[in-house]
Amino acid sequence: MNNSEIININGPLKGEIEVPGDKSMTHRAIMLASLAKGISTIYEPLMGEDCRRTMDIFKLLGVTIEEQDNSIIINSPGYQNFITPHQVLYTGNSGTTTRLLAGLLSGLGIESVLSGDVSIGKRPMDRVMKPLLKMNANISGIDNNYTPLIIKPSTIKGINYQMEVASAQVKSAILLASLFSKEATTLTEFDVSRNHTETLFAHFNIPISIQGKTIQTIPYAIEHIQPRDFHVPGDISSAAFFIVAALITPGSDITIHNVGINPTRSGIIDIVKQMGGNIELSNVSKGAEPTASIHVKYTPNLNAVTIKGDLVPRAIDELPVIALLCTQASNSCIIKNAEELKVKETNRIDTTADMLNLLGFNLQPTHDGLIIHPSEFRSNATVDSQTDHRIGMMLAVASLLSSEPLKIEQFDAVNVSFPGFLPKLKLLENEGK
């Protein structure tokens, strides 16, 4: 990732769009469809770089995956007939692929090596390895914390585990490993994190019990899996950039259709409402993965908010662009209890503050979040995504607050989750003219 992009987009933004399929759900649907013997079709998946890494790995395990227009067809021999890979399983920049497959491959007992790019090599894996080792997984890494992760066959045991952090990736790694255990596994969450693994278990016929923050799988749950088709909703994390762009750009009025509004992911909607933002939902569908159309208009004089507690995991990936939104509030805003931001593609607490402060905004990083003061875009210094897709898109949205072009280094990082992000933003600009 080394290309730069000069962003020169001015408002207002107007029109109707859809965003790519949800990244979290696409990963999980690929994994579960690949485990189930037979044919599953995934409609409207995200075909970004991260999800392609997940597909590539299952191809190496013997799964046939065919891409068609807006869908992928997965023809699996079933988990019982996976082949042992004879090369390193490359996860690229995808923490989801790395951490979830650490659990799944441990459960499968397939000898394998997981390794990613330089960024993945710096991200902690002990949070996944510790519970997996308690489950009798044979998994090791550099300093028992970093990739490459070496996985060898073992017999997975069920555990009763209390989560220490609100992390959907850690939870999912445990649940995926537990599918192959002869004992039940009980997991209690610290705070409820995104529940796509649980909803997709049920969708693919895997028994799972959920009572509040406690989740339980049954012995040998994998034996119940069945192939299923799945329609992936639009990613609310991708929609977030357009929500904020419309809120901060005078005259803007946009609608984003078919966005997933799973309650464990819809924190940004609640935050915008607390700030007094002009946001409305329509065409709301019901079900395990509900969707809606989101209508957003420019809103001046936003209220100050404190974002903390169980709201944080419901908006964890949106917090960088929410921090930008908070610079336009009438008083200082606080984000706290967000330590998880430190172990994303970058330390997003520091990266968000550093990049926005370069542009003249006023953000103070803290040990677990940010203090964001009302401030304006005052400098067109060159900024850098730091190879973090969400930082790159957040900076592009920030450029709407300036009448001058903004140069963003390593902007191609956005392709990890949103190929075509910039053309879609320009489309709304053109509609607004």
From Swiss-Prot:
Subcellular location: Cytoplasm
Molecular function terms, GO-annotated: 3-phosphoshikimate 1-carboxyvinyltransferase activity
Enzyme Commission numbers on file: 2.5.1.19
Main enzyme class: transferase
Recorded catalytic activity of this chain's protein: 3-phosphoshikimate + phosphoenolpyruvate = 5-O-(1-carboxyvinyl)-3-phosphoshikimate + phosphate
Keyword Membrane: no
Active site, renumbered: D317
UniProt keyword terms in alphabetical order: Amino-acid biosynthesis, Aromatic amino acid biosynthesis, Cytoplasm, Transferase
Residues that bind 3-phosphoshikimate: K23, S24, R28, S167, Q169, D317, K344
Pathway: Metabolic intermediate biosynthesis; chorismate biosynthesis; chorismate from D-erythrose 4-phosphate and phosphoenolpyruvate: step 6/7
Gene Ontology cellular-component terms listed: cytoplasm
Function: Catalyzes the transfer of the enolpyruvyl moiety of phosphoenolpyruvate (PEP) to the 5-hydroxyl of shikimate-3-phosphate (S3P) to produce enolpyruvyl shikimate-3-phosphate and inorganic phosphate.
Subunit architecture: Monomer.
Family: Belongs to the EPSP synthase family.
Protein name according to UniProt: 3-phosphoshikimate 1-carboxyvinyltransferase
Naturally occurring in which organism (per UniProt): Staphylococcus epidermidis (strain ATCC 12228 / FDA PCI 1200)
